[in-house]
Design a protein with these regions (language model features):
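Glycine-/charge-enriched secondary-structure boundary and capping motifs
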Residues: 2-4, 8-11, 88-115, 121-128, ...
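Glycine-rich anion/phosphate-binding loops
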Residues: 21, 52-66, 90-101
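Small-aliphatic-rich amphipathic alpha-helix that forms the alpha element of a beta-alpha
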Residues: 57-80, 101-109, 176, 180, ...
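Short beta-strand segments at enzyme active-site cores
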Residues: 75-84, 115-117
Length: 285
């Protein structure tokens, strides 16, 4: 089945200009540039990240988009991707074709080249796992999770909460905003929101400080139903969360056009924060 499947995959790839994989070669050949590279990897596993209610197209789209969100969090420009599939023999070829279509259309949308991959089989049934590694280019300023200072504003893009009602399969990675924050050196620290504010925000807060949040300012999605707890624990918002010097906020607002940005708090000296009883956000294990 392997050779036949590889022939089918080669045919699917041929329909998309962003897929430049030489499927018979052992390695992808990439042009070298002098810029610094960003590399990220993420996985999508049936039964963990999606189930039968999710279309193959949406699953393929999400695999690419969640990796691109990592590139956005560092302010990078995506370049190349490779994919590794592990699946049981009962995964239908038609389903796999739609998965590839979701991946490839998303690659095309964000000018990402799929340059290689691997396929392996496992015993049993109903098993599917896809891991994608994306590389990109970083400019002079790279957004990192460390660097926030006392007095910095805490900001988010878009709206938060309620992702379980499909947003986590239809989100747009915030590449343009991440690139703007990096290019103009506007953010002191940045990350993408994948596990909810309760778990992700502490990663940006330096030791000896805490976050003072304005709960009324947190931008909630319609699917959150007005419940601010959703922004803290739902996870998979795939928005950007960053800190910045107060004097740079209006500069960013003037530059970001239609992109929605919101100040939700500040970094404050001392460790006696107000806290929440919202729990710890999404846990992977």
């Amino acid at each position: 089945r392997e050779r036949g499947l590889l022939r089918e995959i080669a045919a699917w790839l041929a329909a998309f200009p962003q897929a430049s994989a030489a499927i018979d070669d052992d390695c992808a050949l990439l042009e070298a540039r002098r810029e610094r590279r960003l590399v990220t990897v993420d996985s999508l596993i049936f039964g963990r990240h999606f189930d039968e209610s999710v279309s193959a197209f949406d699953a393929g789209r999400k695999l690419v988009a969640r990796n691109l969100s990592d590139i956005a969090a560092n302010g990078g420009v995506p370049s190349d991707a490779v994919i590794a599939l592990v699946m049981s023999g009962d995964v239908a070829q038609g389903w796999l074709k739609e998965f590839y279509r979701g991946m490839l259309e998303t690659c095309e949308r964000y000018n990402l080249k799929l340059v290689g991959g691997d396929v392996a089989s496992v015993a049993g049934t109903h098993f599917f796992s896809a891991s994608m590694t994306i590389s990109g280019f970083a400019g002079t300023h790279v957004l990192r999770r460390t660097g926030a200072n006392v007095g910095d504003f805490i900001c988010v893009s878009g709206t938060l909460g309620g992702s379980i009602r499909r947003k986590h399969f239809a989100f747009e990675p915030q590449l343009a905003l991440g690139q703007l924050l990096a290019e103009k050196n506007l953010a002191s620290a940045c990350m993408d929101l994948t596990d909810g504010l309760a778990k992700d925000l502490p990663a940006l807060v330096p030791a000896g400080t805490h976050s003072a949040l304005d709960f009324s300012a947190i931008p909630l999605s319609e699917d959150a139903g007005g419940n601010v707890k959703a922004a803290f624990v739902d996870g998979e918002d795939y928005e950007l969360l960053w800190t910045m010097a107060p004097e740079k906020f209006e500069q960013l607002r003037a530059l970001c056009g239609n992109m929605k940005i919101t100040k939700i708090g500040e970094i404050v000296a001392g460790t006696a924060g107000a806290g929440t009883d919202f729990g710890g956000g999404f846990e992977h294990f």
